[in-house]
Structures are given as C-alpha cells and as structure tokens.
Swiss-Prot record:
ATP binds at residues 211, 230, 246-254, 295, 331, 447-448, 453. Substrate binds at R64, Y205, K211, R331. Belongs to the phosphoenolpyruvate carboxykinase (ATP) family. Pathway: Carbohydrate biosynthesis; gluconeogenesis. Involved in the gluconeogenesis. Catalyzes the conversion of oxaloacetate (OAA) to phosphoenolpyruvate (PEP) through direct phosphoryl transfer between the nucleoside triphosphate and OAA. Its cofactor is Mn(2+). Keywords: ATP-binding, Cytoplasm, Decarboxylase, Gluconeogenesis, Lyase, Manganese, Metal-binding, Nucleotide-binding. This is Phosphoenolpyruvate carboxykinase (ATP). GO terms for cellular component: cytosol.
Length: 538
C-alpha cells in the first residue's frame, strides 16, 4: 500500500493544505462511480453511453489553448528553450517568476480544502528515460483521462513512487490579474522546468495534460541525445520497426494500425539506445465520422473504461459520431490494451529501420512516394509540410499550406534543428531509410486512394521499394519509383496525372517557393544554411 500520509505531506510541500480526502490512483470501477454519481453538475458530470463508455463535455475549450501556454524564463530555460520571436513565432511564451507564483497560489488555493484525486503514472516506456508524473485534480473524469493516457505503474512501483513532475489541474479557477500581467487571457497552461510543475487554469480540455507532458519530454530527452517524436510506430513479425510522422489528417493513426503488424503507439515516441518506446499508456483518437467499417479497431475500443469528449449523446444514450455541432475535434481516450494487436506488456521495440513522413499535399505536386537522402530527411522533417483544401465563398476549393516543424511544432520546446539532428543520428546508427509519402491529391483532382497508399506502405515495409527502378522528379529532385507491386504505376510520377504537364510545372514552382520562404527561419545557423541545397529549387 502507498502511504497516504506521505502523499498528503508532498501535497503540502506544493502549497495544497487541509485536503479533505485523497483518492489515490483510483481503480476504473471507482472512477466510473465517481464520474457518473448523482449531483455532479456542469463539466464535472459524466454521461453513460450505450457503448459502455462515459462521455464528458469540456465547454468552450474543445482543443488545446496554445495562446495561453507559457514557460517560466529562468537560468535553466533562458538559453535552452526555443522562445517565440518576431521572426519565428511559436507557442513558447516567457513568463516571469512573480506571475508564476501568483498562478501557483491561485491553483493551490483552489485545490486546498478539497477532496482530491491523485494519479501517479509514467510518461515513457523506457525505464531510463521515463518521467514519473503526478497529476492532482478535483475532477474525477480528469483522473480517468490521465489513468488512460499515462503508463499505469504496478503496485510494486507505486510503493516507492517519487514524482519527477507534477501537473496541478485547477480548471475551475481563472486568473483575474491577467491584463496587468500581460497575459493573453484569464486561462493559463504554464510550465516551470526548474520546479518541474505544470499549472492548468480555466480550460477543461483533457489534452492539455497529455500534450503538456509531451512538451516536457520534448525538452528533457533531446538534451541527452534521446529522440522525442510526434509519430506513430509499429513492428512487424520479424521485429522490424517503422515510425510514421505526420500532422493531423495525414493518416498517422490509420496507416500505423495494420493487421500484419503490432502497434507500439499512435502519437508520441522516444528513440533511445535500445530502440523505439511509447510515451503513453493509451490512445487519444478522433471520433468525428467514426464508423465500424472504416476504423474497426478504434470503434471497438470505445467501451467501458474509455472516455468520450464532446460527442453528441442522443436521449437513448447512443452516440452520434457524425454530429460535429460541439466541435469537429471530438475525441476518445482509452487504455492501449483496448486495441488487440499491440506490443505488450511494454510498449517498446527495437530501432526503427523505416521512417515515413506523411503529408497530404492538396496542391497536387508531390509524388505518392519518394526516397529521401539524409539531407532531404532533415529538410522535410524541419519543413513538416501538409496542406488542406479550404472552401472559399465562391465554392472554389483552394489549398492552404501548413508548415509545422518536425511535424509537431506546437509541442517543441527546443530549437527544431536539435530534433532533426537527433533523428538523423539515430537513423544513421540503425541504418534506417526515410520516405516521403503523399496521402493527398494529384492532377486528377482526386485524393490518392487508401488502397494505393497502403500498397506503397507495404512496399516500403517489405523492402520491395528498394528493388524498384528509380527516376527523379525535377524542381524537388526527389527519387521516385517507376513501378511498385499493388500500386497503380500511372500515379507514381505526379506529372503523369495531369493532362498538361505544364500545369504540374507551374504548381510545382509555386509550392517550391512556399517551401523556400518557410525555410528561411532555419537558415539562421550553419546547420540550417547547409540544408537549403536539399530543398526544392524555386
């Protein structure tokens, strides 16, 4: 048994006093009763659905609040954190010690004199590189969320659990002095890397706790040469590991969920001297337009112990997954063992030999697959490109590009080149190859079929792409295969999908110019300047 007196003393050391009761690492059964008990109001209330999962609402915050994210500027962080600047805007805004202290007082005062849930877990399936995390909250479903998402310790591990990092979730409290303090709003998600504490105020969105710790892993791990990556990962029957980077909507979860391979994890991973390891103990999947037919694994994972966020629940308790009236970002968290085909008991495997960058190019320029050189790997990793089709007033759909460093700029705490260097170093040591896979559009105006994309992924994973005859795509100088088993050869060179190749040429020149313009911000140091040659020629 864990000594609750010790936990109470540790809470007092944080400034949380006169706690009525500590509900320590509650079981799923206990959490179910707590979050559905009569008398709960507002966003604390959980609703039982016919799936067996409980659904909760997070109010106006149906996604992360990047404008309210701050990191304390101190001796430790001033020269290490990738701070926002006029030339390279990001979400790492500095906060002074006095403002931090006032926010900490607000949160600890909110949590004092309450009945609290304290959940201890690990971030990272590597014993050497994990962070022991303690989450303190007064809301039952928030305790459920972190129990799903972090790695659940054994009874033995809990006996001697010493937190490396504490998340204090005060979602019921807001900051009345935000204007005088020069902050963005009354809500806040603040980090102190010296005290190793995250404070949350005003926002009820569960993902702040998950992504907050991802940002911290993104700080601590690369500084010791360990990769920290926004990617999914799986492993084949022969132990061959593949990792899939990609922004939202590019197919990261769908393509890494493969009946022929075991899932290591779907979102956040590290790469150390042993290999690839998951940071998480669960999955946080989008549920908008979810169907049993298209995503059976996720559909069947939504059962007792899963937690639905911001979905529309009908009067009979059934869930309408097609209703995005609260948000398009409807989600479900569930423990990873709700997926059958996973690596267990520990979500880790050997070194990756295939690294796949997924992009959904709405411009119709990039090939469905190309093999990258080490320099191109760094260039396209730092660029982190994808594009969406956005409707305009006249019904014309125009592509809007997104460049997100390392396919996860929102979560980077160090300069992007540090992640690129660790990745390429790890890849070279493992003899890994990198590929750029476009799951987007081509000259036909249609999206590349999931059948062709799966065929491409199979060709990468089974090595047949290595035997293919290669050609070169001009402007981007990308190596492209001329034929692959199970893939329509007519799509492999994007120029062939246009009735008039000059059309591809002008679109390619336009997109190349966007890449070049975006990359200027990385050319501030020698490493960045050296990579310009690996990019497209505008």
């Amino acid at each position: 048994m864990t000594d609750l007196n010790k936990v109470v003393k540790e809470l007092e050391a944080l400034g949380i006093y006169d706690v009525k009761e500590v509900v320590y690492n509650p079981s799923y059964e206990q959490l179910f009763e707590e979050e559905t008990k009569p008398g709960l109001e507002g966003f604390e209330k959980g609703t039982l659905t016919t799936t067996g999962a409980v659904a909760v609402d997070t109010g106006i915050f149906t996604g992360r609040s990047p404008k309210d994210k701050y990191i304390v500027l101190d001796e430790k962080t001033k020269d290490t954190v990738w701070w926002t600047s006029e030339t390279a805007k990001n979400d790492n805004k500095p906060m002074n010690q006095a403002t931090w202290q006032s926010l900490k007082d607000l949160v600890t005062n909110q949590l004092s004199r309450k009945r609290l849930f304290v959940v201890d877990g690990f971030c990272g399936a590597s014993e050497h590189d994990r962070i022991a995390v303690r989450i303190v909250t007064e809301v039952a479903w928030q305790a459920h969320f972190v129990k799903n998402m972090f790695i659940r310790p054994t009874e033995e591990q809990l006996k001697n659990f010493e937190p490396d990092f504490v998340v204090m979730n005060g979602s019921k409290v807001t900051n009345p002095n935000w204007k005088e303090q020069g902050l963005n709003s009354e809500n806040f998600v603040a980090f102190n890397l010296t005290e190793r504490i995250q404070l949350i105020g005003g926002t009820w969105y569960g993902g702040e706790m998950k992504k907050g710790m991802f940002s911290m892993m993104n700080y601590f791990l690369p500084l010791k040469g360990v990769g920290a990556m926004h990617c999914s990962a799986n492993v084949g029957k022969d132990g061959d590991v593949a990792i899939f980077f990609g922004l939202s909507g590019t197919g990261k979860t769908t393509l890494s969920t493969d009946p022929k391979r075991e899932l290591i994890g779907d979102d956040e991973h590290g790469w150390d001297d042993v290999g690839i390891f998951n940071f998480e103990g669960g999955c946080y999947a989008k549920t908008i337009h979810l169907s049993e037919e298209n995503e059976p694994d996720i559909y069947h994972a939504i059962r007792r112990d899963a937690l639905l966020e911001n979905v529309v629940v009908r009067s009979d308790g059934s869930v309408d997954f097609d209703d995005g009236s609260k948000t398009e970002n409807t989600r479900v968290s569930y423990p990873i063992y709700h997926i059958d085909n996973i690596v267990k008991p520990v979500s880790r495997a050997g070194h990756a030999t295939k690294v796949i960058f997924l992009t959904a190019d709405a411009f119709g320029v990039l090939p469905p697959v190309s093999k990258l050189t080490p320099e191109q790997t760094k260039y396209y990793f730092l660029s982190g490109f994808t594009a969406k089709l956005a409707g305009t007033e006249r019904g014309i759909t125009e592509p809007t590009p997104t460049f997100s460093a390392c396919f996860g700029a929102a979560f980077l705490t160090l300069h992007p080149t540090q992640y690129a260097e660790v990745l390429v170093k790890r890849m070279q040591a493992a003899g890994a190859e990198a590929y750029l896979v476009n799951t987007g559009w081509n000259g036909t105006g249609k999206r590349i079929s999931i059948k062709d994309t799966r065929g491409i992924i199979d060709a990468i994973l089974d090595g047949s792409i290595e035997k293919a005859e290669m050609g070169e795509l001009p402007i981007f100088n990308l190596a492209i295969p001329k034929a692959l088993p199970g893939v329509d050869s007519a799509i492999l060179d994007p120029r062939d999908t246009y009735a008039d190749k000059a059309q591809w040429q002008s679109k390619a020149e336009d997109l190349a110019g966007r890449f070049v313009k975006n990359f200027v911000k990385y050319a501030t140091n020698e490493e960045g300047k050296a990579l310009i040659a690996a990019g497209p020629k505008a």
